[in-house]
Amino acid sequence: MNDGYQMLAEFYRLKQGGLGPLRSWLDRNWKVAADRVAESQLHKLIVDLNFPALYTTNYDRNLEAAFEVHGKAYAKIANAKQMADAADGVTHIVRYHGDFDDDASLVLTETDFLDRLSFDSPLDIKFRADALARTILFIGYSMSDPNIRLLLHGIWQTWERSGYRDHRPRSFVFMASSNPVQEAMLARWGITLLTPESEACADDALTAFLADIRARIRRP
């Protein structure tokens, strides 16, 4: 959601006293039929790649639906309790901006996003721990999002202050087209920009990229 939608959500909460009806409407209208998810090559690739953790800022349930239709176990994490209860050995789907099943977890309004800038919520702590110990691949994030830029800067700053920056696991951002400004920003934070060799729409480029990763992993 962009800044305009965040302000609209804030206005709605101020006028209505809560987000319940809006949340229910969004949940209904963003729901994608299971058969459509099952037909999605992109979602099949995400399941096949067996990532230890998937962080999403989306509010839809497409990732969970993909794991269910392909018979793969997962653990959804949107709050501290779910984090503690999450099983080992399965993909953790971390709903970074909350889940419609838990209104208190939602990061939807202007105030929610401003409050989140402190980056001290349980999900922020989990992400920082994962980012310190693992290779991170960012897909579909906009560098125009100040929350994302602050988060990336914070990870870089942590490594710079640690005295062990040369031991930092590599991190990557995949984008469908190159942008020299964003590439320079990302390089400053120690993140490599990946782009397709040929022009394609964003979904096709991402599907081809993930298919290539899967092929390389399966290669004897």
Regions found by a protein language model. Name each.
Residues 108-125:
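Active-site glycine-rich loop that binds ribose-phosphate moieties when present
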